[in-house]
Amino acid sequence: MKSALKKSVVSTSISLILASGMAAFAAHAADDVKLKATKTNVAFSDFTPTEYSTKGKPNIIVLTMDDLGYGQLPFDKGSFDPKTMENREVVDTYKIGIDKAIEAAQKSTPTLLSLMDEGVRFTNGYVAHGVSGPSRAAIMTGRAPARFGVYSNTDAQDGIPLTETFLPELFQNHGYYTAAVGKWHLSKISNVPVPEDKQTRDYHDNFTTFSAEEWQPQNRGFDYFMGFHAAGTAYYNSPSLFQNRERVPAKGYISDQLTDEAIGVVDRAKTLDQPFMLYLAYNAPHLPNDNPAPEQYQKQFNTGSQTADNYYASVYSVDQGVKRILEQLKKNGQYDNTIILFTSDNGAVIDGPLPLNGAQKGYKSQTYPGGTHTPMFMWWKGKLQPGNYDKLISAMDFYPTALDAADISIPKDLKLDGVSLLPWLQDKKQGEPHKNLTWITSYSHWFDEENIPFWDNYHKFVRHQSDDYPHNPNTEDLSQFSYTVRNNDYSLVYTVDNNQLGLYKLTDLQQKDNLAAANPQVVKEMQGVVREFIDSSQPPLSEVNQEKFNNIKKALSEAK
């Protein structure tokens, strides 16, 4: 595996740090960073402990899955149109009948479906980016990633700027026990290759990946961390799991280990007599997902494709993990006072089974509906009227909503894009939370039909059916930018690579009926929203994105 097994150039000192558990380094660096944070961070500077009591305050769980499509959670019956999906191209190893695919999706999430039925489904909910790093950064900050120069995973690879406040810090400063479990993907990282005899053709197995000290979760609002710092990790035997700053061994299947950790967080908060704020970021169903899930999950599925069965088994492992967490909350007396906010970090990739993103156009890494319109809900037993909420909302609203529920004020100088949804959900406010949502992102075909040949050959390589690692012509860095703006009626999409502008009704999930020519005034107004957004955002952090960003600005200038 020439590209995947290429060793990182790292210093001997980094290797020694890793081997020794990084203890001495971490202790010194942590003290230094914490001191700086208390002096510079808005969340710290505005906090006075005597102003707030945690008594009776709700527990918070922000729950994410990785690359789960809108159609892979039976979230919206409108996204399960067999006629729309039956002719969809898919990667060979995932080919199954559409009826079996829908059945598998329905069987994989009984617990999540129950929570949705008891809570509020955000049927017009979007994440702030089509790929993981920027999307997760937006959840943490309540701000569009462009505000701090992040337009792609490449921009995020040196860590989310330390000038940005992560909203969990506000919970921590107000007496909450805060924990992050699972995927982090918000740090500047280093990779240390594992011994060659331990390496495989799954690149997740081949490096120990760890965060630079400044970007450690414990320096961004969390009392406790257990998980991985990279974009993904192996489902078994991960070499990159950390508990706080110490590398720890993998124990069985990754979903089960993360669930065990989450239950530990719930129990510690109970012992400490503190409310908790848990960010629980499962790895599933992120690819590569070839290693078989445990039999207790596998036996639920019989689609005719072992690969598809395993995919949905990984989804089911998360669902059953959530079930275990709910049971522990009930046992501890925490169940009735816990809020759960759920989303996928972005849409599904073409390297997965139907229903993928359902009837929607697009995939991960794009701002078509399939890339950013994700299954999203809020559950707070007895506190919210169950049903669908169809106004435009964003995952950037998650932490502002949770902070509002906890009666924690947000410093005004944070300038958030996210808002608390509670006034609308509790019928205290009319109208809609957002007039518009805007995206400026890299636009790649990495995860759509155009790249099926790469994914077919990738599976052959991983399974030792070929010794040639396939060339990927559609990476993020090789792709141009696009912009998208949505209001509560329309979606306006422009892509630089084909100079295409489209205006579509939000109800046109396939974006087949381009209304731009017939609605020039709507187009003009929505382009004005994008210009204002750019003017209040930062240029890309990475050099590779500078020209692409300028191309977007040029296109908007020429459209005046």
Listing of model-derived features with the role each one plays in the protein:
Residues 1-26:
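Gram-negative bacterial Sec-dependent N-terminal signal peptides
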Residues 28-58, 65, 70, 87, ...:
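Long, internal low-complexity/basic segments
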Residues 35, 152-157, 161-169, 173-177, ...:
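Formylglycine-dependent
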Residues 35-37, 70-166, 170-180, 189-199, ...:
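Active-site segment of extracytoplasmic enzymes that catalyze sulfate/phosphate-ester chemistry
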Residues 56, 99-109, 126-131, 154-165, ...:
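A short beta-strand-to-alpha-helix junction
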Residues 56-61, 117-123, 172-179, 220-224, ...:
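Loop/turn elements at helix/coil->beta-strand transitions in domains of secreted/extracellular proteins
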Residues 200-211, 215-218, 223, 348-358, ...:
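C-terminal cap/loop subdomain of S1 sulfatases and analogous C-terminal strand-loop tails that border
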Residues 275, 281, 317-354:
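Metal-dependent active-site segment of extracytoplasmic phospho-/sulfohydrolases and closely related
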